[in-house]
Swiss-Prot record:
Residues annotated as domain Cyclin N-terminal: 204-286
Name recorded for this polypeptide: Cyclin-Y-like protein 2
Gene3D superfamilies: Cyclin-like (1.10.472.10)
SUPFAM superfamilies with a match to the protein in the record: Cyclin-like
SMART domains, per database record: CYCLIN
Gene name per UniProt: CCNYL2
Keywords: Cyclin
Biological processes, Gene Ontology terms: regulation of canonical Wnt signaling pathway
CDD domains, per database record: CYCLIN_CCNY_like (cd20540)
Assigned GO CC terms: plasma membrane
GO molecular function, one term: protein kinase binding
Family affiliation: Belongs to the cyclin family. Cyclin Y subfamily.
Amino acid sequence: MGNILTCCVCPRASPGLHQHQGLVCHCESEIYEAAAGDLIAGVPVAAAVEPGEVTFVAGEGLHMHHICEREMPEDIPLEPNPSDHPKASTIFLRKSQTDVQEKKKKQLCKVSTEHFTQQYSSCSTIFLDDSIASQPHLTMTLKSCDLGTILSYQAKRDAHRSLGIFDEQLHPLTVRKEVLEEYFKYDPEHKLIFRFVRTLFKAMRLTAEFAIVSLIYIERLVSYADIDICPTNWKRIVLGAILLASKVWSDMAVWNEDYCKLFKNITVEEMNELERQFLKLINYNNSITNSVYSRFYFDLRTLAHNNGLYSPVYLLDRERAWKLEAFSRMEQDKVFYSAAKNGSLSADDLIHLQRAKAILF
């Protein structure tokens, strides 16, 4: 494997005959195009060709495609995908910039008192919130992810780029037989999406980082499958993303039966099919790097700030300072013990780890 061997028959009786026997592989190279042109003339007579020497020559001018290039789907865009590359701008932040600029233009003629009520840190006072990349604030993260779903993709009422597996009209989640048609005609409100997601997170006891992972999977689905989020499919798309995120990134066992208990009109087989199709549409790419996760976290903070959503801030006092020092000490101890097992720790690190001090006021 790795080389292409071509069989060349050299007849002695008729050296001008350029006929080939056997099967010819369909390739875009000139060699196989010429061979295909010779086959049009017809099949050579067996008596005209005498037994000759058979030589095997390795094709040097043939272009060998890697196996990953052959399996790469053609419908994936060539531009960097934000769910795969941390340097690419996220879709929800890029599409929400237009709304932010329009809001700023409207606020130019108005005197807003919002910035007067905000608290800022100074040399003597420091205000901190409870949201960090490893442990984001649950409520603010859910609201930001909901904004990233409803504002970024601009849910379309007449979206034709959708799939039947996500259509709620074909696969309803509730037991209500009579669903108003107006429910599927108008874009979902922010409160409706937030209530739906918060119910899932409370029932399954998920933390805030699962919301960020779910949003990454949603962007990956929209980019890979080239579909739109519309009023008829947003619930099943969000459900599939949360289901996949909880299964991949949770340390505990998660069963589809647990999600079926939240919806009375869905069976385990339907939930399995939803998960299977979601994985297939994202090409089974469920891995997320730390840089991509951090990019989504900070872009969500920017999106929340642009829409007037702020995490509750607290004054840094002695008790909170000691807690921060304890958390940092725990991280340092993790680094210390992991480095001690590997035998890669310098003397300077031992000196710094003996007594860690915090600047208090």
